[in-house]
């Protein structure tokens, strides 16, 4: 069992030894591989560096060429900056403008960068790349030789280890023999001891019988012991020698292994690295020097650019631009007045008839000028503060570029902008800058617009003040009586009430036009004319609401067929008149723009090109009926004219579109009005700005066209208007007797038209001034049944002159009434004026476009009746007395009746008729209110000729 344990122990030691040797062999092989790997890594590194240098050289060369092309492109004549002669003049002398000087310095710096990049490319592709190639060759050669040397040392080390194993085996063999010899010796000695122990009793018992035999056996045992002793000593000596050799080999191997691992391997690694780091450092130093030279040149160029930036001078540049382009920025010659066809008047005339219009306008302009001055000053203050804030934001943006670079040395040179708080702050600053810039541009637009308005208002105000001063001097030469006469001559009676078969407000406009024969409904024409005469300069027209009661009164009057805006309305009713006009269009059923066109019209507002949008809208509008299109053309031409006075009325096309968008183009049910109203307003604004291009011309669509210059409806010189103003006390009696006497006329009477008249319905006749009309019977106090040119219809009483015989009867009755009323000058004048023909201004002389124009038409000699001389002599006193009564009624006191002043506060005769109660044109006591009464049954309703 002991032998087996010993054998097992020996096998374990042998396996451990073999494992140790195996591990050492693996380490040595890995050392060779590691050395080769390090050499390969160095060669690859050097190859990568060489490739990098070559590629970097290519990049620098390409960059140099790109910079050169870039500089040449912007330096050549084909660049954007050199596309015009003006730019070429600036390019020849870039010092004229500081930005151009900066531009020239930047181009020069770019050229210098191109040259430096080309030089750097040559250095990188030439010496540095070649030097790296040489270093790679040296490293490869050294690594190969070092590996060979290391392989040799490893072989020697393994040979020593192999010798150690041999010595160990020799030692173990000799030691085994020594152990065996010792065992045999010990066995021989034990046998000898046994024989020696048995020999003593044997000797005492029978020495004589076995003496010789015992002696020979003892001798053999002694010789065996001696022999084995000698063998043991021999093997022991051999074992000792083998052990000594083994121990020496073991020490030698351990020393060799230690020397190899602690010295030889390190020396071999140093051999592989010989000159590598030094050579590589030299190459990188050369690269750094080349980059430093390029950077120094770039810093020098940037310094020059910084100096040019510091020399930026906005005021100086502006002065230089104005100096170079003096012919362009020099104010043009003033526009001169060019009189037409011998007109010698070259200044604003303030006649007595126009003073009531010009004086309020001058006062409105003065108040508007004061408000606009304050507003412009406030906007200017805000503009300066906003500009300062904007410049501060722009200036603070300069340092944000450096925030993108890291300050700590690392392999990455740029921060991650996704999570950088500085980038978020820069984004917020950018948004703040854009917001401030937008606000600044808005305020700049307001300031420039306000300053332009100030200049125009100031010029208008100065001209009007000069005209008013001249007018004050001229009015001193005109008597108050002449002014009052001319003032009365302007007044006129409203047209007789027309009866409509179609509803006006809330009805179908197309059917109303066809039924009434009015190309433009009277409410539209009259309201627009009233605003044209009184409200083009009215501030906030169509935006300020009128009095609801007044709006209702005007609407009801139009519903009755009357024109309440001829008399009874003043400039104070402008907002109410504008409200009536909007109310009319808003109440139409169906609306002017049918709902099926709403989507297509709204789609046109999305078109960015103005010409394309206008063409699209124009094509859509052709689908509307012609009468509706005529009214729309009339309305939007008026709105375009109204927007031209936005300096005074503050109603530009956008503001007017906001007012008329919901009125003309309501959003259909089921759609979001909030989301669509902006596009609706944009469409209406396009119609207001481009009416001439959107709507068809007169040649394509005949009908009335809005005229910018209108005059009040012309009136009779001495008609019922003066009778109502001067003889108000005698009027009830006269009106009571006139219908009774006129109804007594029997038979057909021929009357002469003293004014032209255009029928508004199919039942009303149209005629011209001077036409002979046949009157059959009196239909009402305002209308006659008669015929003209073979057509029968209704003829207005106030537009004709009765025959001489019939007139005498009326005059006689009037004189009798005047005698009953007394012999006062007022009554005499009233009775004289009420019965004579009215040879005066036509109430509505129609122009070629169908609009009423003011024209004075003298009566024919045979129709003219001269005023009685006594009446003429008493007219001045009558007017003064009547004006005195008017002054007392208005609270002016008796002082104003004695010496009427022709100044700006000229008193006006009080209007004798109110809305719906026009005495001269009102229905008689028995006049029917229904259409059947005004237009009796059985009348020939043949349409009027066109």
Curated annotation (Swiss-Prot):
SH3 domain mapped to chain residues: 746-805
Q: Where is this region: Disordered?
A: 187-220, 402-435, 885-946
> Entry's PROSITE patterns?
F_BAR, RHOGAP, SH3
Q: Where is the composition biased (Basic and acidic residues)?
A: 187-196
Q: Where is the composition biased (Pro residues)?
A: 901-910
Instruction: Show the GO cellular component annotation of the record.
Output: cytoplasm; cytosol; growth cone; microtubule; nucleoplasm
Q: What protein does this entry describe?
A: Rho GTPase-activating protein 4
| Pfam families in UniProt | FCH, RhoGAP, SH3_9
Q: Where is this site: Arginine finger?
A: 543
Q: Which GO terms describe its molecular function?
A: GTPase activator activity; identical protein binding
Q: Which GO annotations describe the biological process of this protein?
A: cytoskeleton organization; negative regulation of axon extension; negative regulation of cell migration; negative regulation of fibroblast migration; nervous system development; regulation of small GTPase mediated signal transduction; Rho protein signal transduction
Name the cystine pairs: none
Composition skew (Low complexity), residue ranges: 202-211, 407-419, 924-934
Q: Which part of the chain is the Rho-GAP domain?
A: 507-695
The organism of origin for this protein: Homo sapiens (Human)
This molecule's function is given as: Inhibitory effect on stress fiber organization. May down-regulate Rho-like GTPase in hematopoietic cells.
> Taking every annotated instance into account, which residue ranges of this chain make up the domain F-BAR?
19-317
Residue(s) carrying Phosphoserine: 860, 901, 906
Where does it localize? Answer: Cytoplasm
Keywords, sorted A to Z? Coiled coil, Cytoplasm, GTPase activation, Phosphoprotein, SH3 domain
Q: For this UniProt entry, which segments traverse the membrane?
A: none
Tell me the superkingdom of the source.
Eukaryota
Coiled-coil portions: 128-195
Complex and partners: Interacts with NCKAP1L.
Q: Which gene encodes it?
A: ARHGAP4
Q: Which tissues does it occur in?
A: Predominantly in hematopoietic cells (spleen, thymus and leukocytes); low levels in placenta, lung and various fetal tissues.
